[in-house]
């Protein structure tokens, strides 16, 4: 079995600081439920400075990172607006999250180790 590890970051639209403790707690529960339903694992989830999210997940290769982000941002946005309608006053156009996000793969092998391995392979033949 194979999993790919990702570090993701995304922010609230207009960087509004709406991620208060009550919202953060509900968001944490939502993210874990989404992961369980969709087949990936959330290792770490943090709301930072009230306006952005850091999330560390593992997923099988059949589940693309774009799908994971779509699930997380789409479902949480809809559910947060339902549960906390007052946050709409600070946001408009019905969008909770910025469209963009940052993602990187995370592994235990450095670029230098990969480079050495590949260079060594070409000299073996």
Predicted regions and their residues:
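Basic nucleic-acid-binding interfaces
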Residues: 1-125
């Amino acid at each position: 079995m194979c999993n790919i590890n990702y570090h993701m970051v995304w922010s609230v639209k207009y960087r509004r600081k709406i991620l208060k403790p009550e919202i953060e707690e509900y968001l944490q529960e939502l993210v874990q439920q989404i992961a369980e339903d969709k087949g990936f694992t959330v290792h770490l989830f943090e709301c930072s400075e009230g306006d952005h999210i850091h999330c560390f997940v593992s997923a099988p290769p059949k589940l693309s990172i774009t799908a994971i982000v779509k699930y997380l941002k789409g479902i949480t946005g809809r559910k947060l607006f339902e549960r906390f309608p007052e946050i709409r006053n600070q946001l408009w156009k019905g969008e909770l999250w910025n469209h963009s996000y940052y993602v990187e793969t995370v592994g235990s092998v450095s670029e230098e180790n990969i480079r050495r391995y590949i260079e060594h392979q070409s000299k073996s033949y």
